[in-house]
């Protein structure tokens, strides 16, 4: 059940009505309804996945309590590592086993040995990377005594399985979401209205921007061997806006839906393509994942407290693990490695920005220097996105190579569909809207909000009529 589907358009109002008019007696009935709705939502992909979600929920609920109750450090460590190993074990089996089996077989073959890997015919459960990280952060925080264990199973189950964030984030923290589900929510008209605005803007990003760019990005990447330089450059740009519109659109919808139920989720995107360097980009892009790796991997490794080489080592570890988190393919690992390389000049010059607000708070007309920094950062991310999108490392390298070897800057035709100036104009308008609204979480809100909403709905209907591309990219992670 996708957020941009008719099924969800029917599902959401039903849950909303039941939540506020039938199950609104107390927080327990509200939470119970949301859990049932979440389990139904998740089972729409494959009901068998539900067993793994329930098991993971019970595992971390039980081990969290045992960690808190244990009187000895040995006992605390036992329950802590049990949760860590089982969670990562399931993630490894479903997501990475075949990748490692094939990689080792290829390595042995390269040395002249015959190897036939034993592969598992497993379907990757939707959202496993996200809800596994929810549970891991909860158990880690209990072990380090940052939070108390949650003894109410219903409340904890909702924290893990809450349907807006279940399959593609944001990756929530127990310190942020659990206190909200432990109290009864009261309906607030203004909050609900903001939620509707944010849902509509998320659909604009997904249906109008991402799905339209996907048509051309897919055609270019699938036929890159016959494309000229201009087409390949456009293909990388189209994919950059496809993945941004797709993922940030999903996050906007998730945040908006949560506001309808009186819950506040972590913001996941903060206009990342207006970043002036790669460090700022990663403070604005997939914020919940970046902060998760910072708090649970980078800082425990020593963070930035050590010398230069420790900072470099930790940065490379973080980005390679981040690439690996995204998928079991060498292209994702190379993508992470490239982003780590982008960090090197900042680490060597000790100019890693901590303040991400200055470019947002200042003028509508920026200086040439700031504009150059923004464009340079965007182009660097586009180069990295080529590896993220390509099927193999070889495809990515050849794609980039053809940009410099097949220098032709004319429009090309794709499957009898021409590149149209309207798409580039649409992206340009989208960028201007983002820039003009960079201080807002919901760009539709504010003055003339009803007019903006009407125009947004018309755009969704118009583009949705001609778009067959439905699935959100991050569902595969």
Report each predicted region and the residues it spans.
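Membrane-embedded transmembrane alpha-helical bundles that form the catalytic cores
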Residues: 1-429, 435-476
């Amino acid at each position: 059940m996708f957020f941009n589907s008719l099924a969800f358009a029917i599902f959401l109002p039903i849950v909303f009505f039941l939540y506020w008019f039938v199950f609104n007696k107390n927080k327990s009935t509200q939470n119970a309804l949301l859990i049932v709705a979440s389990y139904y939502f998740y089972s729409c992909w494959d009901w068998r996945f539900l067993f793994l979600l329930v098991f993971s929920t019970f595992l971390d609920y039980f081990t969290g309590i045992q960690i808190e109750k244990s009187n000895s450090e040995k006992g605390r460590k036992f329950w802590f590592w049990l949760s860590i190993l089982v969670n990562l074990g399931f993630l490894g089996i479903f997501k990475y086993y075949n990748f490692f089996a094939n990689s080792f077989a290829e390595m042995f073959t390269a040395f002249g040995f015959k190897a036939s890997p034993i592969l598992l015919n497993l379907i990757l459960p939707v959202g496993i990377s996200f809800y596994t990280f929810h549970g891991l952060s909860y158990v880690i925080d209990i072990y380090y005594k940052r939070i108390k264990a949650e003894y109410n199973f219903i409340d904890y189950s909702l924290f893990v399985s809450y349907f807006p964030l279940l399959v593609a984030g944001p990756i929530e923290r127990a310190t942020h979401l659990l206190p909200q589900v432990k109290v009864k929510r009261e309906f607030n008209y203004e909050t609900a209205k903001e939620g509707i605005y944010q849902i509509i803007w998320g659909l604009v990003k997904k249906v109008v921007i991402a799905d339209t760019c996907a048509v051309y990005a897919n055609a270019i990447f699938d036929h890159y061997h016959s494309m000229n330089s201009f087409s390949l450059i456009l293909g990388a740009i189209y994919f950059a806006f496809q993945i941004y519109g797709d993922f940030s659109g999903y996050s906007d919808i998730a945040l908006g839906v949560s506001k309808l139920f009186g819950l506040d989720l972590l913001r996941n995107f903060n206009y990342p393509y207006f970043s002036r360097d790669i460090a700022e980009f990663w403070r604005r892009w997939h914020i919940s994942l970046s902060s998760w790796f910072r708090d649970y991997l980078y800082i425990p490794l020593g963070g930035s407290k050590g010398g230069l080489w420790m900072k470099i080592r930790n940065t490379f570890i973080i980005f390679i693990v981040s690439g690996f988190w995204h998928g079991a393919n060498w292209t994702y690992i190379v993508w992470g490695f490239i982003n780590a390389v982008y960090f090197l000049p900042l680490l060597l010059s000790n100019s890693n920005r901590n303040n991400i607000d200055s470019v947002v708070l200042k003028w509508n007309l920026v200086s040439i220097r700031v504009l150059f920094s923004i464009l340079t950062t965007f182009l660097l991310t586009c180069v990295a996105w080529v590896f993220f999108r390509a099927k193999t490392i070889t495809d990515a390298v050849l794609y980039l190579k053809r940009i410099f070897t097949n220098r032709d800057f004319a429009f090309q035709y794709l499957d009898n569909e021409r590149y149209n100036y309207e798409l580039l104009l649409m992206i340009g308008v989208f960028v201007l809207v983002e820039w003009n609204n960079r201080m807002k979480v919901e760009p539709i809100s504010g003055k003339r909000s009803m007019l903006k909403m009407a125009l947004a709905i018309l755009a969704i209907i118009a583009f949705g009529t001609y778009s067959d591309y439905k699935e959100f990219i991050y569902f595969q992670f």
